[in-house]
Regions:
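Conserved beta-strand position immediately N-terminal to the Walker
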Residues: 168-169, 400, 481
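P-loop NTPase motor domains
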Residues: 202-203, 207-213, 242-468, 475
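Basic- and hydrophobic-enriched, low-structure N-terminal and domain-boundary segments
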Residues: 1-173, 186, 193-197, 436-438
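Short secondary-structure boundary/capping segments
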Residues: 74, 214-228, 258-260, 457-461, ...
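Conserved nucleotide-binding/hydrolysis micro-motifs of P-loop NTPases
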Residues: 30, 62-64, 102-105, 206-210, ...
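Conserved ATP-driven motor cores of ASCE-family P-loop NTPases powering translocation/secretion/packaging/pilus
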Residues: 464-521
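Conserved catalytic network of the ASCE P-loop NTPase/AAA+ motor domain
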Residues: 161-162, 192-196, 235-237, 391-392, ...
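Glycine-rich phosphate-binding loop of nucleotide-binding enzymes
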Residues: 143-242, 492
Length: 521
């Protein structure tokens, strides 16, 4: 192994010895280094022949002098004279504290005092980080060290999208953390490297941010394009994208309530890539038990995910909907309202008061235009969510716009998509072949809205479904990529099942709440 320039030597003292996992070293005065730089350190070989190398990542830097205290420095400056020049400079050096990552001969003994410290080379850094010999590398970015080396960092696909491990979480404050930007970079990497294996579903949760991802960016500078090339990727827009917008009775807006510019939607319609999703009664209320539409009754509970229901009375009402004969939402609301007068007889009796509460909620929460019937005419371009998922294939992307919807409808649509994909992977839909979907990656921002850390004594329906996805989805091929501002606001089991965590810029309040940030302290 080629010998590099020596930049310092290990120091082990009585009060701060080296250990199996940590090491201290002083630096040559002309060396510039920073936290997260990687170095290699000479170590014993184990068999007495030659030497081995340990690799460490710098965690903290400190400068120490022979001064007994700050007051001594004050006195040495002629008792506080800021213009005084010292006769002799104090003896001092920079001390680096580093965490040991490993050894090229698997030596786990503490590093000896006086051991030579050198810059680690690019190949050594990749090997120390465990990304040197990946079976299917997915570019995750690159790092630049203080000695101007640039090293590409990859993920192993088997641990990012399964089947060995799966799910990713991105956290950081709004705007500055670039959560969505990094997620889009990673999804582009998946599409470029695994076009025959991975399909993608995105949720647009704010403004028109993700409603033109198949269009080239006009703001991408040459320097940014070079950064893509350093990662081994082409700085190109995503391909094979279909957009689902919330249906609305607004012909002048292409029958949608989306915030996307009208000219953008019209261009997508011309290319047959834009549709308006809606919910009809039959699909939503469910059919007979055992029918594939029976899951609709489960999804209806998402409408009330923010309503306290300790006695599960609303769930009981929902389960009775399959017996109601109704072809339109008006008819369904009318049939439910009829039950508020007489209730139900028999062993499954539901109190009239419960039906009245349920009727009131159904009436107020199904007035949005998205609750509709299929209208004739191509101009409306209506499509059920399940039909859009049936058409999903590896290499394709489905963008679902939920930004203009109120929170309870956002939870409904998000949960509907998650449950439909999960059930399709369980072969609960006769019309969907689970192998045709490939491995489905679902990306959602503001994950804390759907899986909050505190939901009372009982997790709500959507949270339970997300827990099922993160706990069982890896083996089925359903992968969740989530992002949020505050990691501490996410359900602990959802976080615990994520094999990959990405940390963006955050604030001191979040640092004090989320235990995971102790890794960086």
């Amino acid at each position: 192994m080629m010998e590099q320039k020596c930049i310092g030597k290990v120091t082990a003292t009585e009060s701060k010895p080296t250990t199996c996992t940590s090491v201290y070293f002083w630096l040559s005065p002309d060396v510039i280094i920073r936290p997260f730089d990687l170095v290699r350190i000479e170590h014993i070989s184990g068999d007495g022949s030659g030497k081995s190398y340990s690799y460490a990542i710098v965690r903290e830097l400190s400068y120490i002098t022979d001064s007994a205290g700050h007051l001594a420095n004050y006195v040495s400056s002629d008792f506080g004279d800021i213009t005084a020049q010292p006769m002799n400079e104090r003896l001092g050096t920079t001390i680096a504290e580093a965490d040991v990552l490993g050894n090229n001969r698997n030596i786990e003994m503490p590093i000896r005092d006086g051991a030579r410290v050198e810059w680690a080379g690019p190949d050594e850094i990749r090997d120390a980080l465990g990304v040197a010999n990946l079976q299917q590398p997915i570019p995750g970015g690159y790092i630049q060290t203080s000695n101007k080396e640039e090293i590409r960092i990859d993920f192993e696909a088997r641990y990012l999208v399964g089947p060995e491990a799966a799910h990713m979480n991105i956290s950081g404050i709004s705007g500055l953390a670039s959560k969505t930007s990094y997620a889009m970079f990673l999804l582009s990497a998946l599409q470029q490297r695994m076009p025959n294996d991975v399909s993608i579903i995105l949720f647009n949760v704010k403004g028109p941010d993700l409603l033109a991802i198949d269009q080239p960016s006009t703001s991408l500078s040459d320097a940014q394009k070079d950064e893509w090339h350093k990662c081994g990727l082409d700085p190109e827009p995503l391909e094979n994208v279909t957009y689902l917008y919330p249906y609305a009775k607004r012909q002048e807006r292409c029958f949608t309530s989306s915030h996307a510019p009208k000219d953008v939607i019209e261009a997508q319609i011309q290319q047959d890539r834009a549709f308006n999703y809606y919910y009809d009664v039959e699909t939503f209320k469910g059919g007979e038990a055992g029918n594939e539409t029976d899951v609709g009754r489960d999804k209806m509970s998402l409408l009330f995910s923010d309503i306290d229901d300790p006695q599960s009375t609303m769930e009981s009402c929902i389960q009775e909907l399959g017996d109601i004969q109704a072809e339109t939402w008006d008819k369904l609301r009318e049939e439910i309202r009829a039950k508020t007068a007489k209730g139900q007889a028999g062993p499954k009796e539901i109190p009239v008061q419960s039906w009245r509460k349920f009727s009131r909620l159904i009436r107020t929460r199904t007035t949005h235009d998205v609750f509709s019937s299929l209208w004739p005419g191509e101009g409306r371009r209506q499509k059920l969510v399940v039909d859009a998922i049936k058409e999903l294939r590896p290499g394709k992307i489905l963008v679902v716009d939920i930004a203009p919807l109120p929170d309870y409808l956002q939870c409904l649509v998000f949960g509907d998509v998650i449950r439909t994909v999960f059930d399709a992977k369980l072969d609960l839909y006769e019309s969907i072949n689970r192998e045709d979907l490939g491995r489905v990656v679902v990306f959602a921002d503001e994950l804390n809205k759907y899986a909050p850390s505190s939901t009372g004594s009982r997790d709500r329906t959507l949270t339970r479904w997300l827990l099922e996805v993160t706990e069982r989805g890896r083996s089925l091929g359903v992968v969740l990529f989530g992002a949020e501002q505050f990691r501490s606001g996410i359900h602990s089991r959802v976080l615990g099942n994520c094999s990959t965590d990405v940390f963006g810029r955050t604030n001191p309040v979040e640092l004090s709440k989320a235990a995971d940030y102790k890794l960086f302290s």
